[in-house]
A protein has these predicted regions:
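N-terminal periplasmic/intermembrane-space "pro-region" immediately following the signal or transit peptide
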Residues: 2, 24-90, 315
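Membrane-embedded beta-strand positions of outer-membrane beta-barrel proteins
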Residues: 67-69, 114, 157-159, 189, ...
Length: 461
């Protein structure tokens, strides 16, 4: 815990300097901080901040070091979590996240990226969830070796601990919304050109504990696969992927058993001005205990962005179908597994996860000011199968459902505001009201509507 506090003090001091000082503009920060590259500062005069982002280590400046980090503070207020089933009522708590990273480039062919992260929780009545607290851990520590490079084409081998994030985050996400982000340890080979890229990887997952450097590596392959992207100019982008997982124990309403699951999927998408779309479908097969897996998902998210209109509004309509188990009394399983999804795929702090679900989700955004963006959502949720339950955003079982014939889970109403003070400082706040439906009212005696509020202050450098 003392180590985590030390990192907190260092990061706070750096952010205080950045906030009070004059900071030059630079590239936007990436979701995966290791995707940033500050080599463009090589031949320029640099202020204090830019000297943190590019520290030459030799006269030729092809050996260099870059530093970065983040501090995030969040207040959470939850009333009737899990629709009153836990009998907690009002539950408010604080979350903090700190990280520091160093990116070392050793010529054109070698690179080492290292990152420490601390995620802290204070005040939650029923204790920290797995997504809330990991007091201090090594989030990234990997070596990149460039095996081949020619013009815009490159082949890179990466080995070590690393974060992963692919596509829209339905299946493999770094999980940015929750306080503790995901990571894996393993190897990845990456090929990229101007219009085509593909990653192939084999990874192990840790068992996460809340203390300091106490996470335990599984020592067996948990995740493997390949993810590719093809760019079609003007038309959009096509993703094709295969993902495999192996777990010694997986829990669904049907029961607990070893699981080996394969996912084959595709995504066709386009963002930007005018017509926008995100279409995705995936099929899963494999084994669960002595039975076979036969599961699937399909999603359509279609909208329009009015970039040349005042407030630059966007309007979208999304519809998801995600399979659930049809009969818990036989050995075969039709429940879709979202693998390692991001927590906020159906809105911030969602109450319903991407398993056994049909949803209709209209949403819209407005740029109220150049620095202030608003998003409003309504999410209508049904169970796909009345023989399966309701699952959490992580994909774990929350409420068994085969005892009820009711299908409608409930309606979530959301409003979210993001204010960018500048490139380095942001404020995010949101409120969610969840009106319970017939299924929740049938399963939970005296069920209650849920209300969620959060306010988050973030710093990055």
């Amino acid at each position: 815990m003392e180590s985590a506090k030390s990192i907190s003090k260092i990061v706070k001091s750096l952010f205080l300097f950045l906030f009070l000082g004059t900071i030059a503009s630079a590239q936007n920060f990436k979701l995966l901080r290791y995707d940033e590259n500050y080599e463009s500062l090589k031949d320029s005069s640099r202020n204090f901040y830019e000297n943190l982002k590019f520290v030459p280590l030799n006269q030729e400046k092809d050996f260099y070091l870059s530093f970065g980090g983040e501090a995030r503070y969040e207040y959470v207020d939850f009333n009737n979590e899990d629709w009153g089933r836990l009998n907690i009522g009002h539950n408010n708590f604080l979350l903090q996240r700190y990280d520091l990273h160093a990116d070392i480039h050793l010529g054109k062919n070698f690179r080492v990226f290292a990152q420490l992260r601390s995620a802290l929780q204070d005040g939650r009545i029923n204790g920290p969830r797995g997504i809330d607290e990991d007091q201090l851990n090594i989030q990234n520590l990997f070596l990149d070796v460039t095996l081949w490079q020619q013009k815009d084409k490159k082949l890179i081998l990466r080995a070590g601990r690393q974060e992963l994030d692919y596509g829209s985050g339905r299946l493999i996400s770094v999980r940015e919304g929750p306080n503790a982000r995901l990571y894996f340890t393993g190897g990845k080979i990456m090929y990229a050109s101007s219009r085509f890229s593909i990653d192939a990887f084999a990874m192990m997952a840790d068992t996460i504990y809340a203390g300091v450097f106490d996470n335990k590596m599984s020592k067996q392959l948990n995740l493997w696969g390949a993810y590719s992207k093809i760019i079609f100019p003007k038309a959009g982008n096509l993703d094709l992927y295969y993902l495999g997982i192996k777990r010694n124990e997986s829990l669904f309403e049907q029961g607990i058993a070893p699981e080996k699951r394969h996912t084959a999927g595709t995504r066709f998408w386009k963002y930007g001005g005018g017509f926008i779309y995100n279409l995705e479908a995936a099929y899963q097969f494999g084994s669960f205990g002595s039975g076979n897996i036969n599961a699937w998902t399909a999603s359509a998210d279609i909208g329009y962005s009015f970039e040349n209109t005042k407030f630059k509004p966007t309007i979208n309509l999304r519809n998801d179908y995600i399979s659930g188990d049809l009969n818990k009394n036989n050995e075969n399983l039709q429940t879709f597994n979202p693998l390692y999804p991001k927590g906020g795929y159906f809105g911030f702090s969602p109450q319903v996860g991407p398993v056994n679900l049909i949803d209709i989700h209209p949403y819209a955004t407005l740029d109220l000011l150049p620095e202030l963006k608003m998003q409003v959502d309504v999410v209508f949720n049904w169970r796909y199968s009345t023989n399966d339950g309701v699952y959490r955003p992580s994909g774990t079982l929350n409420l068994a459902g085969s005892a009820s014939d009711e299908r409608y889970i409930g309606t979530a109403y959301l409003a979210n505001f993001t204010y960018s003070v500048n490139k380095y400082i942001s404020v995010v706040s949101g409120i969610q009201y969840f009106k319970t439906g017939a299924f929740i009212n049938d399963i939970i005696p005296n069920s209650k509507d849920g209300v969620f509020f959060n306010a988050r202050l973030g710093f990055k450098f």
